[in-house]
Design a protein with these regions (language model features):
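C-terminal motif of bacterial Sec signal peptides marking the signal peptidase cleavage site
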Residues: 17-20
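Bacterial N-terminal signal peptides that target proteins for export
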Residues: 1-8
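Interaction-mediating elements
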Residues: 22-320
Length: 320
C-alpha cells in the first residue's frame, strides 16, 4: 500500500512538472484568478477607539481569502498551491482518474467573480453609516499581475467626519417610566458627544426594556419604542429620541405585582401532575403523595415573593 501511494505521488509530481505547475491553465476565458488583496488604504482615519473598532470590522467585511491563504489572511499566500495546481492539471480531463484526482486533491480556484469587490464595497459603506461615518466611502482598484490571468485587489476607505450624538431623549413614556429612566441615567449605553452608532443605540433600547421589565412592566417589549433621529438641525451631530409607540395598550403602561406562584415539579417532560400543595402564595404541583422537594427548599430558591414588583431578571434567576 505504501508503494502504491509513493507511485501516485511520484506520478503526480511528473504531471505537475510537465504542466509547469500552472495555477491558471484551466481558468475559463473572461475570468481571472483572484490572488489576494494589497493592504487597505485608510484616508483621514483617526486613532480613536471607535475608529479602530470600525477599521477592524471593515477588514473582515472587505476580506476575501485567495487560494493558498496563510492563516486565513487575504493578503498572505503560500507559494505552494498544490490543490490549485492539481485542479488546473486535471479538471479538463474526462477520465475517471482525472475526476478522482480533482475530487481527492484538487482545490477550485477563487475567481475575481467570486471576490465580487462591488458587493464588498456596498456592505462596507453601509457599515460606515451604521457606525456614524455618514459621508464615508469605499472604492477599490484592480492590481494587474505579470500573468494577465491573475489579478489582485486593493480597497481605499475614506472615513470622513464622525457624526456624534447631540442629545438623547426619551419621549412619550409615562411619569413612572420617566422616573425610572432618570434614576438609572448613569447606566445609559450612550450619551451626548458619543459617536452615533446603531449597535450602541440598540443596546440602549435593550437596556431600557430590561429596566422596565425588572421594575414591574411585565408586558413591555423592546419593539414598543423606536428611534427618531434628526441629522439636519446641527450638521455633524444627530439629535436622537427613543419614542414610545402611540398604540400601546393600558396594561403595558402599568406595573404588575406578584400574587400567586405556581411551581410544577416533573421528573420527566410528560409526567402527569395530580397533586397540589397549597401555601399562602406558593402552590406546588407534582405527581404522587409527596413533593419531590420540600417547600422550604423551594421557597429559598424562588426569588420572587408575593407583593413584589415583577422582575424578569429574578424570574430568570429562579428558573435556572
Amino acid at each position: 500500500m505504501k508503494q502504491i501511494y509513493l507511485f501516485l505521488w511520484a506520478a503526480l509530481g511528473v504531471v505537475l512538472l510537465s504542466t509547469g505547475c500552472s495555477s491558471t491553465s484551466a481558468i475559463p476565458d473572461g475570468e481571472q484568478l483572484y490572488t489576494g488583496m494589497k493592504p487597505t488604504e485608510y484616508v483621514d482615519a483617526d486613532k480613536s477607539e471607535h475608529a479602530t473598532s470600525v477599521r477592524e470590522e471593515l477588514e473582515v467585511v472587505l476580506a476575501t481569502k485567495p487560494n493558498g491563504s496563510l492563516f486565513g489572511s487575504p493578503t498572505l499566500q503560500s507559494p505552494l498551491k498544490i490543490g490549485l495546481w492539481i485542479w488546473n492539471a486535471f479538471s479538463q480531463g474526462t477520465t475517471s482518474f482525472d475526476k478522482w484526482m480533482v475530487k481527492a486533491f484538487g482545490t477550485q480556484p477563487v475567481l475575481m467573480s467570486y471576490a465580487n469587490p462591488d458587493l464588498h464595497t456596498t456592505v462596507g459603506r453601509n457599515l460606515l453609516k451604521k457606525r456614524g461615518y455618514f459621508n464615508g466611502d469605499i472604492s477599490y482598484s484592480l492590481v494587474p499581475q505579470k500573468n494577465p490571468k491573475k489579478m489582485k485587489l486593493q480597497y481605499a476607505v475614506k472615513m470622513g467626519q464622525l457624526w456624534t450624538i447631540d442629545t438623547l431623549g426619551y419621549v412619550g413614556f409615562t411619569p413612572g417610566q420617566d422616573s425610572l429612566i432618570s434614576a438609572h441615567a448613569d447606566e445609559a449605553m450612550t450619551r451626548s458627544g458619543a459617536p452615533f452608532d446603531i449597535s450602541t443605540l440598540e443596546s440602549e433600547r435593550q437596556r431600557i426594556t430590561q429596566l422596565f421589565r425588572d421594575n414591574g412592566y411585565f408586558y413591555y417589549e423592546k419593539g414598543m419604542a423606536s428611534y427618531l433621529a434628526d441629522s439636519v438641525s446641527r450638521p455633524g451631530t444627530v439629535a436622537v429620541n427613543l419614542q414610545l409607540l402611540d398604540s400601546i395598550d393600558g396594561r403595558t403602561l402599568r406595573t404588575w405585582t406578584i400574587r400567586n406562584i405556581n411551581v410544577n415539579l416533573r421528573r420527566s417532560l410528560f409526567e402527569n401532575i395530580d397533586t397540589t400543595s397549597h401555601g399562602r402564595s406558593l402552590r406546588v404541583h407534582y405527581n404522587g403523595t409527596h413533593s419531590p422537594l420540600r417547600r422550604r427548599v423551594l421557597s429559598n430558591q424562588i426569588k420572587l415573593k408575593r407583593g413584589d414588583l415583577y422582575s424578569a431578571s429574578l424570574q430568570e434567576e429562579t428558573q435556572q
